[in-house]
Regions:
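Terminal substrate-recognition subdomain of acyl/acetyltransferases
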Residues: 146-154
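Conserved beta-strand-loop-alpha-helix junction that forms the acyl-donor binding cleft
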Residues: 88, 114-124, 141-145
Length: 154
């Protein structure tokens, strides 16, 4: 699997499509996260030097994405970890997560946070725990019942 930082207009459009697929798969209205504004402004907060918007390419096909953004002086947030269905179950999600964690360390962040949901994201929660993420109190308001907040010390 290869990773590219989405930067060209074509790459940004591909990332936007993946984000839209992610939102449809999630089956939750992400308006509380200003998702429409996020899509319109890509790469936005995910742009270097403080952020990343990575897309995964597997067998010359766009497989998935992951992003990170700065949310505090030494803290970043992992966002939008997503794989298209035909690429799941092959360890690619772990590779995406490990790559974005390595990017966060390279930037100089000391901790990475994320929020996730039980149910549809149970496999992701298992992955996050395996990578060393620990549950923490909510660090922002997420109105979705059962939202889980996690942090990894980098």
């Amino acid at each position: 699997m290869n990773f590219i930082q989405a930067s060209s207009p074509e790459e940004i459009e591909s990332a936007r499509e993946l984000f839209e697929e992610y939102a449809a798969w999630l089956q939750i209205d992400l308006c509380f996260q200003s998702f429409d504004k996020e899509l319109a402004g890509l790469p936005g907060q995910y742009a270097p030097p403080d952020g990343r918007l990575l897309m995964a390419i597997e067998d010359d096909q766009l497989a998935g994405c992951v992003a990170l953004r700065k949310i505090g002086e030494d803290t970043c947030e992992m966002k939008r970890l997503f794989l298209r269905s035909q690429f799941r179950g092959k360890g690619l999600g772990r590779k995406l997560a490990e790559t974005i964690i390595a990017e966060a360390r390279q930037i100089g962040y000391e901790r990475m946070r994320l929020d996730t949901l039980p149910g549809r994201m149970d496999q992701a929660i298992k992955l996050y725990r395996a990578l060393g993420f620990q549950e923490i109190p909510a660090y922002y308001h997420n109105p979705v019942e059962g939202a889980t907040f996690m942090e990894l010390l980098l």
